[in-house]
Design a protein with these regions (language model features):
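Nucleotide-activated donor-dependent transferases that construct or modify glycoconjugates
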Residues: 2-16, 66
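Generic beta-structure capping elements
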Residues: 7-9, 152, 160-161, 172-174
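Glycine- and acidic-residue-enriched helix-capping/strand-helix junction motifs
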Residues: 13-25
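Short aromatic-enriched loop/helix-cap "lid" or pocket-rim segments at secondary-structure transitions
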Residues: 17-19, 159-161, 169
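Radical SAM [4Fe-4S] cluster-binding motif and immediate context
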Residues: 24, 167-175
């Protein structure tokens, strides 16, 4: 089984202990588990949602094959540092960044972030799942829509992803 770690770090509100369930990244995983090849080949080891010192978080990430990061304005810099440190420690780990703050025009992105392997654009459910299927040889990479690929620092982008039907996405609360 391949180890998957996901993170959608919370917005920090000074003086509060408010945390939330990382719904968006939970939906991405919930959708993935409905698709061929995922449950037989991958296990979700953890979903992180609380920003803590990266050294502490790294102790909880053991032998990752895939790290998926949902990025927003408030966690972009943290996610990029986490991605860099995970790639440094586990060079074989595939780093995937998606979410609302992922650049749609990603030319030059990988030159300054060589530790990121893939970006997902628009709705990440099918793109993330397609990448997981690619990693186990069940799908050609260029057939995975909505992805930018780090090709030795150059950006290769596949076609746009199609919108998915909300009825096809299970609730992460009910898994």
């Amino acid at each position: 089984m391949k180890n998957v770690y996901l993170a959608q770090m919370s917005l920090e509100i000074p003086g509060s202990n408010y945390y939330y369930f990382p719904y968006s990244i939970g939906v991405v995983w919930a959708y993935a588990t409905t698709q061929p090849g995922i449950n037989e080949n991958y296990q979700l080891c953890n979903i992180f949602s609380v920003k803590e010192p990266i050294d502490q978080l790294l102790e909880k990430i053991i032998d990752p094959d895939v790290l998926g990061l949902s990025t927003y304005t408030w966690n972009t810099m943290y996610n990029e540092e986490l991605a860099r440190r995970v790639k440094e420690r586990y060079p074989q780990c595939q780093i995937i960044i998606g979410g609302a703050n992922t650049p749609n025009l990603s030319n030059g992105y990988f030159k300054t972030r060589p530790y990121v392997d893939y970006l997902t654009h628009q709705e990440g459910e099918s793109s993330f799942t397609g990448l997981l299927q690619h990693f186990i040889g069940e799908r050609e990479l260029m057939d995975v829509a909505g992805v930018s690929i780090n090709d030795a620092g150059k950006t290769v982008t596949t076609g746009p992803s199609k919108r998915i039907e909300l009825d096809d996405v299970p609730s992460p609360y009910l898994m």
